[in-house]
């Protein structure tokens, strides 16, 4: 996460894996999580109606790193899940801002917004400078909302809220 920073490096790794009979893959562990799989199925089936927005928080206190910032360390997990929930469509706009509070030039916290062609916005907050651990992804749609809280035990990790939007005239 990421596999590498340049396409040439990726090609070399693919060739090396092919020549040695090895499997090469990026460590997007959440792609195989049963709750993420259920989230994908519910969205594909239209159970949430029109998706309005997605939020994700991956926050904790520490481990402070010197070789990478919080975005590189934490966000690949959430980005991979958000992209899969959006049918692997790439965003048409990405905005990211962050703050380096502990070490100059190494962001401890970042806020990222991604806009997709269908109007869905995804908001992502990652930080290793936060008082408590939070690993939560929320999907809000016109016919329901889902919250995936990866800090809870498995039976409680995924909660579906069936509340429709009531429009005022």
Indicate residue ranges for each PLM-predicted region.
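Beta-strand-loop-alpha-helix segment that lines the small-molecule cofactor/substrate pocket
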Residues: 1-31
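Basic phosphate/pyrophosphate-binding loop/patch that engages nucleotide-derived ligands
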Residues: 14-23, 37-51, 117, 140-145
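Rossmann-like dinucleotide-binding domain that binds NAD(P)(H)
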Residues: 61-132, 136-138, 151
């Amino acid at each position: 996460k990421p596999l590498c920073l340049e396409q040439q490096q990726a090609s070399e790794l693919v060739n090396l894996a092919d020549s040695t009979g090895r499997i090469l893959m990026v460590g997007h562990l959440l792609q195989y999580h049963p709750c993420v799989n259920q989230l994908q199925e519910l969205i594909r089936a239209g159970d949430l109606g029109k998706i309005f927005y997605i939020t994700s928080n991956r926050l904790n206190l520490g481990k402070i790193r010197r070789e990478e910032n919080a975005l590189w360390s934490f966000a690949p997990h959430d980005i991979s899940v958000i992209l899969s929930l959006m049918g692997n469509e790439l965003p048409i706009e990405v905005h990211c801002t962050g703050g380096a509070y502990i070490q100059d030039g190494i962001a401890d916290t970042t806020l990222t917004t991604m806009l997709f062609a269908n109007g869905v916005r995804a908001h992502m907050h990652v930080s290793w400078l936060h008082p408590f651990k939070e690993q939560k992804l929320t999907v809000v749609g016109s016919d329901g909302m889902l919250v995936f809280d990866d800090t809870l035990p498995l039976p409680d990790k995924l909660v579906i809220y069936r509340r429709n939007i009531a429009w005022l005239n």
